[in-house]
Amino acid sequence: MQSVFLHEVEGAASLGGVSLTKIAQEFGTPLFVFSGDALRARVDEFVTAFGSEWPHFELMPSLKACPIIGVRALLTKLDCGCDVFGPGELEGALRAGVPPSRISVNGSIKDQEIIRKAIGLGARIVIDSPREASLVNRIAKDMSTVARVMLRLKPDMTDVQATSDFAPDLRIADLTQRIKYGIPNSELDDIAALWSKLDAVQLVGFHSHMGRHSKDLGVWQAWVSAIAKKLLTLEPLLGDVESPVVNIGGGFASTLDADLDVVNRSGQTPSLPEFAKAICQSLREGLSGSKYNWSDWTLEIEPGRGLHSDTGLHLTTVRNLKNERSGAEQRWAEVDTSEVFLDLHGVPDECP
């Protein structure tokens, strides 16, 4: 791992100036180790880059990107909101001190328990289907309150021919439609017709998520343009919201871009100012048809691996070395962790 926070001191690795050997001796292994300074610096980079392009900007790291409570607690102190999926992540966000009003509850099959808890806390609920919209409305009415909600959209990028870095033989435009998350485009008319009957929900904005399919700024510009086009058709449902939210999701490559689940890691990762400029320019253009001035919209992003990947590591101890010298030579290092944590399943031989 190459990082300004990772150094070699007297033949041993140190993170943020702290010896990893000493950390292993004190706390044992396996262990996730993060640099607080690296996280602070990366949050500041995101906020500075996007905040200079958009007056109302919120950083919404998902808990799934790093479900370590201590890391999340630091992000809370750094004024980050939180995107959660399921009751476990909601509980994790609360334990990490995230204000409920800064939590968005995602997921395509939320049960009544988590919906009721989210409404009671005052967290936002991201609606994934007309059925779920009716369910949230019914529960909120039973609780004699109004639920703040967003609609998760599945923008069309039919003209984009770029393929995914996860699966280079498949088009991003097809993969973003293939995933189950989000309201099917064929059901948007249904939810629009239903909305006037829902008197216990308040629509505050729209949510989408592409994922780490591409570092190409042109793909990102096409993505946010498609989001804007889709949300404008549903904008009348917003009612009297003063500063509606557009959450474009995430999928930002980390600077090192060393994640092994990405097949195509070629090319330079754009800087965050380059990402921000390209994305915000296209979003401003896309929102030109809105009844709101573009600057009235709150822009949210979910930085994911772009925030976490270069700020820490997984520390493990080599317990044994084995060598095979008969036939094809092999060497194994047996460590006290699991491939589940190292994400090594199916890694080709040429991977570092």
PLM region spans:
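A charged N-terminal "starter" segment
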Residues: 1-148, 170, 197-198, 202, ...
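Structured alpha-helical segments in the cores of large, soluble enzyme domains
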Residues: 42, 106, 184-202, 227-241, ...
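Short acidic, glycine/serine/threonine-rich loops at helix termini
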Residues: 72, 95, 115-119, 136-139, ...
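Glycine-rich tight-turn/loop motif centered on a GG-T
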Residues: 28-31, 101, 120-124, 164-183, ...
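Charged (often Lys/Glu-rich) extended helix/loop segments that serve as interaction or gating elements
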Residues: 278-352
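Glycine-rich beta-strand-to-loop/alpha-helix junction loops that act as flexible
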Residues: 210-211, 246-255, 301-305
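Alpha-helix-loop-beta-strand connector modules within alpha/beta enzyme cores
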Residues: 146, 227-233, 275-287
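Non-cysteine beta-strand/loop elements that form the S-adenosyl-L-methionine
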Residues: 85-88, 106-110, 146-171, 201-208, ...
